[in-house]
């Protein structure tokens, strides 16, 4: 073997660049990274300073990370209510995307609604679930008649409106069930309501507006105080003020 050939063999042989050399790069890190909170509220939740979502609702703290909801409500369920294509006319022609309507809830007084449009169905569903988690609200449940057992219905009549659709929720006796359309019934089931009558008016075929109207209606249950809540109570200090040092701690960067 001549000297040039031996030198080429030592370099890795003839052919493409770096061919024959051992791969020095390690395997790709396919493991999912843990949640690194970027907000003060997220740091307190991950540190265990805030253990219930009611503390967040009591002080009207904005939730910017969906992992907060996953931590405080581990039993949250999601349901895809509708997926439909939407089009936009452009110079190059019609651009088609997909809109997903998603509802999340724990069947124990918490429910959220998310709507997202994306190029792919899977991306629209994933983003819709995140938006629904960020929009989770509490539901005030009550009784029809005597206060026996666990709350099974709504405390009062409520009404919600979106577009031309108006949805009215009326408390019902125990055992009546949810008398509503399939979409609204699923929303109320995820909210934890067992017995309720519903009345809807307008273009109810527009499923998106119907769900929005029902979502506004059940959200209005906390829009006012019933007589049993008229007594003045001292407002506790916000967790952001109690744990201000832990909330302001930034992650060290090297």
Curated annotation (Swiss-Prot):
Omega-N-methylarginine: residues bearing it: 11, 17
Alphabetical GO biological process terms: cytoplasmic translation; positive regulation of translational fidelity; ribosomal subunit export from nucleus; rRNA processing; translation
Glycyl lysine isopeptide (Lys-Gly) (interchain with G-Cter in ubiquitin) crosslink site(s): 33
GO molecular function: small ribosomal subunit rRNA binding; structural constituent of ribosome
Chief site of localization: cytoplasm
Record-linked InterPro entries: Ribosomal_Su5_D2-typ_SF (IPR020568), Ribosomal_uS5 (IPR000851), Ribosomal_uS5_C (IPR005324), Ribosomal_uS5_euk/arc (IPR005711), Ribosomal_uS5_N (IPR013810), Ribosomal_uS5_N_CS (IPR018192), Ribsml_uS5_D2-typ_fold_subgr (IPR014721)
Keyword presence, tRNA processing: no
Subcellular location: Cytoplasm; Nucleus, Nucleolus
Composition bias, Basic residues: 18-27
Polar residues bias locations: 1-10
Paired cysteines (S-S): none
Residues with N-acetylserine modification: 2
Cited Pfam families: Ribosomal_S5, Ribosomal_S5_C
PTM remark: N-terminally acetylated by acetyltransferase NatA.
Region (Disordered): 1-34
SUPFAM superfamilies: dsRNA-binding domain-like, Ribosomal protein S5 domain 2-like
Domain S5 DRBM: start-end pairs: 76-139
Residues with PTM Asymmetric dimethylarginine: 11
Keywords: Acetylation, Cytoplasm, Isopeptide bond, Methylation, Nucleus, Ribonucleoprotein, Ribosomal protein, Ribosome biogenesis, rRNA processing, Ubl conjugation
GO cellular component, as recorded: cytoplasm; cytosol; cytosolic small ribosomal subunit; nucleolus; nucleoplasm; small-subunit processome
Family: Belongs to the universal ribosomal protein uS5 family.
Subunit organization: Component of the small ribosomal subunit (SSU). Mature yeast ribosomes consist of a small (40S) and a large (60S) subunit. The 40S small subunit contains 1 molecule of ribosomal RNA (18S rRNA) and 33 different proteins (encoded by 57 genes). The large 60S subunit contains 3 rRNA molecules (25S, 5.8S and 5S rRNA) and 46 different proteins (encoded by 81 genes). Interacts with snoRNA U3. Interacts with MPP10. Component of the ribosomal small subunit (SSU) processome composed of at least 40 protein subunits and snoRNA U3.
Biological role: Component of the ribosome, a large ribonucleoprotein complex responsible for the synthesis of proteins in the cell. The small ribosomal subunit (SSU) binds messenger RNAs (mRNAs) and translates the encoded message by selecting cognate aminoacyl-transfer RNA (tRNA) molecules. The large subunit (LSU) contains the ribosomal catalytic site termed the peptidyl transferase center (PTC), which catalyzes the formation of peptide bonds, thereby polymerizing the amino acids delivered by tRNAs into a polypeptide chain.
Descriptive protein name: Small ribosomal subunit protein uS5
């Amino acid at each position: 073997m001549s000297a040039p050939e031996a030198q080429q063999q030592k370099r890795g042989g003839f052919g493409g660049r770096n061919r024959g050399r051992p791969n020095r790069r390690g395997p790709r890190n396919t493991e999912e990274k843990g949640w690194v909170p970027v907000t003060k509220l997220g740091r307190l939740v991950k540190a265990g300073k805030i253990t219930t979502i009611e503390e967040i609702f009591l002080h009207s703290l904005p939730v910017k990370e969906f992992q907060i909801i996953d931590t405080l409500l581990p039993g949250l369920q999601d349901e895809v209510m509708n997926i439909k294509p939407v089009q936009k006319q452009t110079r190059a022609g019609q651009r088609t995307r997909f809109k997903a309507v998603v509802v999340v809830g724990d069947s124990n007084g918490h429910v959220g609604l998310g709507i997202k449009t994306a190029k792919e169905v899977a991306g629209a569903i994933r983003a819709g679930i995140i938006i629904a988690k960020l929009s989770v609200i509490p539901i005030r449940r009550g009784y029809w008649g005597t206060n026996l057992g666990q709350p099974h219905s709504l405390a009062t009549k409520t009404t919600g409106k979106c577009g031309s659709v108006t949805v009215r929720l009326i408390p019902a006796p125990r055992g009546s069930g949810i008398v509503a359309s399939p979409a609204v019934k699923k929303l109320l089931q995820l909210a934890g309501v067992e017995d309720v009558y519903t009345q809807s008016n307008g273009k109810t075929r527009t499923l998106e507006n119907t769900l929005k109207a029902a979502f506004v209606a059940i959200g209005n249950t906390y829009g006012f105080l019933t007589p049993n809540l008229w007594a003045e109570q001292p407002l506790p200090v916000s967790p952001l003020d109690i744990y201000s040092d832990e909330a302001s701690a930034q992650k060290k960067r090297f």
